[in-house]
UniProtKB/Swiss-Prot annotation:
It comes from Lodderomyces elongisporus (strain ATCC 11503 / CBS 2605 / JCM 1781 / NBRC 1676 / NRRL YB-4239) (Yeast). It is found in: Mitochondrion. GO terms for biological process: mitochondrial translation. The keyword Membrane does not apply. Pfam families: MRP-L47 (PF06984). GO terms for molecular function: structural constituent of ribosome. One of its GO terms (cellular component) is mitochondrial large ribosomal subunit. The lineage of its organism: Eukaryota, Fungi, Dikarya, Ascomycota, Saccharomycotina. Residues 1-19 form a transit peptide. Its main location: mitochondrion. This is Large ribosomal subunit protein uL29m.
Length: 296
């Protein structure tokens, strides 16, 4: 299509549009609704709306900004000595309670400034106490982290840990009769205490759970289970030690007999191999996630 024909088409479209003016008929029959004044009653807000968390009394809050007398002026910040006595769960919970209160204060201060209220000093004073508490929580957590790293780096602590693992391995392999089930339960607890391997894994926390310590724990417990299986089943031809995470993982996810069968199938198919370090965590994350999704 040429430029001339396009221009002609545009002109005809404009001219046709002009020949059809907008007209209203029967104007007397048109009924107009009265205007709706903008009031709070015209809006319905869910009582469970997340933004209610920014108000001190939630959906029961009656004032957008608290009066000075309604503020808690007598409270004080948490001391480091008090925080050191709290568990990790308590510190985590306390951190978010304080953070929520800071968000409430920040909303009130921002609103007060937007409508010209200048006296927000009391709000800021309370916020300063909350900030000091948050800083002390971080300090206490840092102290614990440093203490943990020093304890892990201590040769004596590591030697004691290795001695205990060797002693446990001997008791586990020599267990007989009813002791076997009891030692299996102890192994599950040991995995969690020494290596952080949860008895029940969760997809939501999987990325945080799998680390170098997790891999070490899986190696220890899987080879221990395989050795026990060979001892109870002398006819078994399972060659030990296991060849890395690919063969160790089945012992973490399945019963020992099923795990042994899977390892044999891997070896017979030629798929079993030792993983590079850079492959290990992605492989474990993908395999465990797939297993957990299959159970849902």
């Amino acid at each position: 299509m040429s430029i001339t024909s396009i221009r002609a088409l545009l002109r005809s479209a404009v001219s046709l549009a002009r020949t059809k003016p907008l007209r209203f008929t029967n104007l007397k029959d048109i009924k107009l609704r009265p205007p709706i004044p903008p009031t709070v009653e015209n809006f319905q807000v869910s009582p469970d709306h997340p933004l209610w968390q920014f108000f001190p009394e939630g959906n029961q809050t009656t004032n957008a900004i608290r009066e000075q007398d309604d503020l808690d002026h007598d409270s004080r910040e948490w001391t480091s000595a008090e925080l050191r006595q709290k568990s990790f769960e308590d510190l985590h919970r306390l951190w978010y309670i304080i953070l929520k209160e800071r968000n409430i204060l920040a909303r009130e201060v921002r609103l007060a400034e937007s409508i010209g209220m200048r006296d927000v000093k009391q709000f800021n004073n309370i916020d300063y106490k909350l900030i000091k508490s948050l800083r002390r929580i971080k300090q206490v957590l840092l102290e614990r982290h440093i203490a943990f790293e020093r304890s892990q780096a201590s040769p004596s602590v590591q030697e004691e840990k290795n001695e205990y693992l060797e002693e446990f391995s001997e008791r586990y392999l020599n267990a007989e009769g009813k002791e076997i089930e009891e030692m299996d339960e102890k192994l599950d607890r040991l995995q969690y205490a020494f290596f952080g391997i949860e008895p029940t894994m969760d997809i939501e926390t999987l990325q945080d759970d799998i680390d170098v310590n997790f891999i070490k724990g899986m190696e220890y417990s899987s080879n221990l289970k395989a050795q026990k299986y060979n001892k109870l089943n002398p006819e078994s031809e399972l060659e030990l030690p296991l060849r890395g995470p690919m063969e160790e993982l089945p012992f973490l996810l399945f019963d020992v007999e099923d795990a042994v069968q899977q390892v044999k199938e891997l070896r017979e198919s030629g798929q079993s191999r030792e993983l590079y370090k850079i492959e290990t965590i992605p492989f474990l994350s993908k395999a465990i996630k797939s297993h957990l999704e299959g159970q849902e």
